[in-house]
A protein has these predicted regions:
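Serine-hydrolase catalytic machinery in alpha/beta-hydrolase-like enzymes
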Residues: 2-135
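The feature captures the conserved acid-bearing segment of alpha/beta-hydrolase catalytic domains
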Residues: 26-27, 166-264
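Active-site signature of alpha/beta-hydrolase-fold catalytic machinery across serine-
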Residues: 50, 152-156
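Active-site catalytic microenvironments for nucleophilic, acid-base chemistry
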Residues: 54, 156-160
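Intrinsically disordered, low-complexity domain-flanking/linker segments in eukaryotic proteins
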Residues: 78-84, 159-173, 199
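Short beta-strand immediately N-terminal to the catalytic nucleophile in serine-hydrolase-like folds
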Residues: 139-142, 183
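Gly/Ala-rich beta-loop-alpha elbow adjacent to hydrolase catalytic centers
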Residues: 142-146, 150
Length: 264
């Protein structure tokens, strides 16, 4: 099947379940790879579309995806009167569950619905099935909960035949993405295949975090190394897991992108 550049109308059938914002290269016909971006908890696709435009990867079509469900106003500290108003705060989980230990939202709320929509419909049904791309043409980038989703989808891809809702299109998925970047997001246990004889996932991954990361501690890194063939870790000097704030923090991400764009 010949490859063609996706158009906005290719994704309209996903609405309102899934909404995307697309950022094309300056010359769309130069597109050779696709970057799919997942924002963090409580954000929206708009900010990550802007991020993609700012980094301006050559020959890369960026698709920033909106979280699958809105956050309740109460969790955002907003008055109940805003409950019926349009929101710009979304999340990726199947549910919103508070930890009994910390009172914070559980980092692994289950991602079955996001997996079905993003991997089953956006990636296989549209990018692969309709437009003729391969999974090794596709990079993933996520922050926080979105980073966990990026790692989880990369983990699940090694068992493509078992994926939830992956039924659209008539082309099979490959077993690895071109690469995946997670900032501050851990690999969700719910997205690790259950087979004890499973092979390691083939997607090269880069995880970036602060020195006092809440989720990407030594155990989380060990888990990644058990589940993926190629894991790179960047520990920033800053304490938290916020998005890159300067050239020094962004440099390893850009180097990873450059390497992966040269691959295959």
């Amino acid at each position: 099947m010949p490859t063609r550049i996706p158009k906005p109308e290719d994704f309209t059938y996903l609405e309102p379940s899934l909404n995307v914002s697309m950022v094309f290269p300056e010359i769309p016909e130069t597109t050779t790879s696709i970057l799919v971006l997942f924002h963090g908890l409580g954000d929206s696709e708009a900010s990550f579309a802007k991020f993609a435009k700012n980094i301006n990867l050559p020959g890369v079509l960026a698709i920033s995806v909106r979280g699958i469900s809105p956050l309740p106003p109460a969790l955002l500290g907003l008055p109940g009167s805003e409950a019926g108003q349009p929101t710009s705060h979304f999340h990726w989980g199947d549910d919103l569950t508070l930890s009994s230990d910390t009172g914070d939202l559980e980092p692994d709320p289950g991602f079955s619905k996001a997996e079905e929509l993003v991997l089953g419909k956006l990636i296989q049904g549209t990018l692969v099935g309709k437009c003729g791309w391969e999974t090794n043409d596709i990079l993933l980038f996520g922050f926080g909960q979105g980073g966990s989703l990026a790692l989880g989808l990369s983990s699940k891809l090694r068992k493509a035949e078992e994926l939830v809702g992956v039924t659209e299109g008539n082309r099979e998925l490959g077993l690895a993405f071109k690469g995946a970047v997670s900032i501050g997001g851990q690999l969700p246990s719910s997205m690790i295949p259950s087979s004890s004889a499973r092979s390691k996932a083939g997607t090269p991954v880069l995880v970036c975090h602060g020195r006092n990361s809440e989720l990407l501690d030594s155990e989380a890194i060990e888990l990644l190394n058990r589940e993926f063939v190629d894991v790179r870790e960047v520990k920033w000097m800053k304490a938290d897991d916020s998005m890159p704030r300067n050239r020094h923090e962004m440099l390893p991400i850009m180097q990873f992108f450059a390497e992966r764009l040269r691959a295959w």
